Regions:
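N-terminal mature-domain "stem" immediately C-terminal to a signal peptide or N-terminal signal-anchor/transmembrane
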Residues: 1-6
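Charge-dense polyanion-binding interfaces
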Residues: 7, 11
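Noncatalytic, helix-rich "gating/capping" subdomain that lines the substrate-entry/channel surface
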Residues: 12-307
Length: 307
């Protein structure tokens, strides 16, 4: 399928056999921008710097919390691990879920005493960041401070988030909370104001699979006394937000750690990487187009009947 899409989208880039659908026409424009490697090289890191400087300029925990909703609506990093997806008990209804922050290492087991792979992977991650962050004008002292704080917070986080094995036990993850009870777990976060600005109302309930995170870690993490740690994670998140869109050197460098984890020896060719990046916001439209092109009406009817 990937080779087919490379062929088809290559034709679209050359102005051949262009789709009539307006959404797909926007995909063609977006893909053309993402695949303009000369323009990406010329721009360097300039497109990333406004976000990085905005995050650097945050002056306090109160300043941070006052901008949570604005960051959420703009797709900027804000360390708010919430999502909307179907209710386990009623798949026809979408509900709010309270997840957890992500770990650096692949699973909590890598943080256990005696695990030799954990420190090895963490060293690879840190080395990658020490090469990557200078590209965004972070000084050597800033980089050390950010990485020291992020790694320390990550080690503490690992004590409270679910392991991969625990996450697989779906029947044990359904913990509904009344909204008032949930927001009381993190009293320093203005969650009522956050959700009112983001969705126009406060939720009435929330499903919390990551109870340990919210009960034992989040109250300490989301606090004014922990601002320096939060700020470090935000600055790192701001830098990483742009890596797939910038120069080829940065794209390849930013994938070193993930390639180590997955055992992939070489980075993907830039043409394939650009297509994958462009496909993300248009996946549904492209899927419908592919089905219409490759499935006969009879095959479509057969699938619909089975569903």
């Amino acid at each position: 399928i990937e080779n087919l899409m490379l062929d088809i989208t290559g034709k679209w880039q050359r102005g051949e056999e262009l789709p009539e659908d307006s959404i797909l026409q926007n995909f063609v424009k977006y893909h053309k921008m993402v695949a303009d490697f000369d323009a990406r090289e010329a721009a360097g890191v300039a497109p990333a710097m406004p976000l990085i400087n905005e995050i650097k300029a945050l002056s306090s925990f109160e300043d941070y919390t006052s901008k949570l909703a604005a960051f959420e609506l703009a797709g900027k990093p804000n360390l708010m691990p919430f999502g909307v997806s179907p209710d386990f008990m009623n798949a026809q209804m979408n509900v709010l879920w309270g997840e957890a922050l992500s770990l650096i290492l692949p699973d909590t087991t890598y943080y256990e005493e005696g695990n030799e792979k954990g420190p090895e992977l963490l060293a690879i991650w840190r080395q990658m960041m020490e090469k990557l962050l200078p590209k965004f004008d972070f000084s050597e002292a800033e980089i050390k401070d950010i990485l020291d704080k992020v790694i320390a917070a990550d080690a503490e986080l690992a004590k409270y988030v679910l392991s991969n094995e625990e996450k697989s036990e779906y029947n044990k993850l359904y913990h509904p909370y009344e909204w008032a009870d949930f927001k009381a777990l993190v009293p320093e976060l203005p969650l009522d104001a956050f959700f009112t600005e983001v969705i126009g109302q406060t939720p009435d309930k929330i499903i919390v699979p990551e109870e340990r995170f919210w009960k034992e870690f989040a109250p300490k993490f989301y606090s004014a006394t922990n601002w320096e740690s939060i700020h470090a994670k935000l600055k790192l998140g701001a830098a990483l937000s742009w890596t797939l869109f910038l120069t080829e050197e940065i794209r390849v460098l930013s994938g070193e750690y993930s390639r180590t984890i997955t055992g992939i020896p070489e980075p993907r060719p830039k043409e394939k990487a650009a297509l994958s990046l462009a496909e993300v916001p248009y996946s549904q439209a492209l899927g419908l187009w592919y089905a219409g092109e490759k499935f006969s009406p009879e095959a479509k009817a057969d699938v619909e009947h089975k569903v």
